[in-house]
Amino acid sequence: MNIAEQVKDALKEEIIAAVVKAGLADESQVPDVLLEVPKDKTHGDYSTNMAMQLARIAKKAPRQIAEDIVKAFDKGKASIEKMDIAGPGFINFYMNNQYLTKLIPAVLEAKEAYGETNTGGGQKVQVEFVSANPTGDLHLGHARGAAVGDSLCNILDKAGFDVSREYYINDAGNQINNLALSVEVRYFEALGLEKEMPEDGYRGEDIKGIGQKLADEFGDRFVHESEEERMKFFREYGLKYELEKLRVDLENFRVPFDVWYSETSLYENGKIEPALETLREKGYVFEEDGATWLRSTDFGDDKDRVLIKKDGSFTYLLPDIAYHKDKLDRGFDQLINIWGADHHGYIPRMKAAIQALGYPAGKLEVEIIQLVHLYKNGEKMKMSKRTGKAVTMRDLIEEVGLDATRYFFAMRSAATHMDFDLDLAISTSNENPVYYAQYAHARICSMLRQGEEKGYEPNLEKADFSHIQSEKEYDLLKIIGGFPEVVAEAAEKRIPHRVTNYIYDLASALHSFYNAEKVIDVENETKTTARLSLMKATQITLANALKLIGVSAPEKM
């Protein structure tokens, strides 16, 4: 348990004790203590509505109850400096700030582990994200999904969940046939031969590259092969090429995966029929008009869904159900899918399938990634000026840098449309949030270097934390102390942007402290050491938070 949790628990215990001591209720009758952090810090560090909760039990006005609680409260036991009553009976608590200095040694000793919580309790969570078709470059929606998905995985891991990151390779559908046909066209063109591009063909530069590579490596060998042999080879070659490109792009984006799961393996390993049989045994499959259907309306879907068409071919839904059954068979406690905005309508049928398999709908969570719009010079940008094509993830990283791309994509709720300001992302000003945060980290590192040059360094044995007493220092410590709670909240609510908000608050408090206080005082070694220790605690916390969203913490800028 971290110090912030210890303080809150002590405060809750003392509130309950005060309620009982004041004769307002028996301990068994006291409701759960709700503590909130007031938005306005002049209203204290914590606030509770316990008086309103007790009104019916104590048969008194909430304000009178609040006064009784305040009189019976032992401030010393809960590190409380003072209390006051606001409005109809809210009780505000102002902490004795000296308790905050206990955070400094705790953070310095925890180092990279600071912020870890046991919120997840080892729960096995699988997060499937990106899962773009291996038929071309990753676009902006994929990039946002990759950044959000990886950040969420990092946060879940920090919060004590057992996380598995998975990429589902769509390699069994018609898109792979189209990929092979498109490669064939470019291969023939590279040899100076004509071939018509199919209507659904892929026209990207990367497909031209595959065709040229094949021509260079094999000459006209495949011109003389049978169509069947040629397509088989081009499917495998094109898929391998595109997958490797995806892997490299994602690794360069600091997005690793534990599992790359092939859709084709569902067929090869006989996973489809058992999934269908399970649904049939549970009574949710029926035949109509020559097709096989899932009775998804039993679970709130707006209509029943076809699983097998009249011609005997599978719809997308059946292998998807088999895939999700396989996930559940692997023993995951929770499945999280991160999908693009175009998949929104697919959620009810997939949730229905999960329930038809015998699991609660909540076993599958789906986070939707909304669209991204780029702006440059105040105008919406649709195409890359360099290529004349749609902007890819690689283009964006080249334009604004890896850190800015990761930070900006993690900065807003994934459920909202995003306007990505390219000019802001590359500006070296405090208006740019990633620059502001990284500059705070570099500024701390500079202070630590200056201290070292003068013979001072963070030292818990030499530091006298009674020197930590300014409002700016306490503001920093309160934010540092809140980091584990932020991690827990971001994990539980699946909101990585909560961490970027926190990073901004911590950076802002650091800059404010830097502009108001002097860290190195050559006439007072214990004070200097205490403040350098505070700076080290801030640096550790900021670096840990940045790491969660895949952003580097530079020591110099």
Curated annotation (Swiss-Prot):
Which Gene3D superfamilies does the UniProt entry name for this protein?
Arginyl tRNA synthetase N-terminal domain, HUPs, Isoleucyl-tRNA Synthetase, Domain 1
Q: Which GO terms describe its cellular component?
A: cytoplasm
Q: What is its main location?
A: cytoplasm
Task: List the SMART domains.
Answer: Arg_tRNA_synt_N, DALR_1
Q: What is its EC number?
A: 6.1.1.19
According to the UniProt entry, where does the motif 'HIGH' region sit in this chain?
Answer: 132-142
- Locations listed in the record: Cytoplasm
* GO BP term, example: arginyl-tRNA aminoacylation
- Kind of enzyme, top EC level? ligase
Reaction(s) this enzyme catalyzes, per UniProt: tRNA(Arg) + L-arginine + ATP = L-arginyl-tRNA(Arg) + AMP + diphosphate
Identify the CDD domains for this entry: Anticodon_Ia_Arg (cd07956), ArgRS_core (cd00671)
Could you tell me the keywords of this UniProt record? Aminoacyl-tRNA synthetase, ATP-binding, Cytoplasm, Ligase, Nucleotide-binding, Protein biosynthesis
The entry lists its GO molecular-function terms as: arginine-tRNA ligase activity; ATP binding
User: What is an example of a Pfam family matching this protein?
Assistant: Arg_tRNA_synt_N
Top-rank taxon of the source lineage equals Bacteria
Q: NCBIfam families from the entry?
A: argS
> Which PANTHER family does this UniProt record tie to the protein?
ARGININE--TRNA LIGASE, CYTOPLASMIC (PTHR11956:SF5), ARGINYL-TRNA SYNTHETASE (PTHR11956)
Its family remark reads:
Belongs to the class-I aminoacyl-tRNA synthetase family.
Q: How does it assemble?
A: Monomer.
- Name of the featured protein: Arginine--tRNA ligase
According to its UniProt entry, this protein's organism is: Bacillus pumilus (strain SAFR-032)
